[in-house]
């Protein structure tokens, strides 16, 4: 492990495998290499600056507490701020946007902050246990997060297991119904469908047209990384995250979204778990025998 400017870089036999980044607005994983050394992730593309490798977020998070601090402005619109939210809000509501923060042009802004990281190195791989806080732009705490990211090098694929627990602090918190929420992967530009890549799910359905909004046990995204090589990333939700629709796009992002159709209220101390295994492999989905 090498630590450099809030990056925890993982190597196996001298080969760079992945890095866990603290980030300015949220923690994320980037880069992530296949055994042959091809990076399968993209960070902050021009079309969506908030798509940072592998990360977690939610567009509509609100604290359900009665009191004067929740008085909201009657101003409306995406560009406005609310007194309680203290930062960019979701289309004029009192919910805080923890999804698109990196794309906002004005501050102060909400942030997902790493408070501590414990590292464990074993034969299985390297695990990072992080205590994380979701705070709005006025530093109100909305969610406590406990995240474990385990990086394992392999001959057929390099593996990242990311499991996170989102917990309400001393008051109930609502995670509203949202299109933009969940556990996100943004694939490397050359892998996306628009540049010759391909999305395949467990049922054999292909690309955005056939896979978007469907429930599937796994999704693979692969494409050309050089003139002669193909690489990709497979995502396998953990049992607690299985059964939710996939957001798959031909231009590069895919994510698991438990809040696509229904909101969720977490009572004080109550937690919700979301997670997945990510496999960076060489070759196509079929070549890698996903």
Locate predicted features.
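Hydrophobic beta-strand positions in extracellular immunoglobulin-like domains
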Residues: 132-134, 166, 278
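Active-site/ligand-binding surface loops and adjacent short beta/alpha elements
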Residues: 172-241
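Extended, loop-rich substrate-binding clefts of extracytoplasmic carbohydrate-active enzymes
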Residues: 55-156
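Beta-strand-rich recognition/accessory modules
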Residues: 233-290
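Acidic (Asp/Glu-rich), glycine- and aromatic
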Residues: 17-34, 147, 153-196
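A short, structured loop/turn motif at beta-sheet edges
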Residues: 15, 117-125, 153-156, 224-230, ...
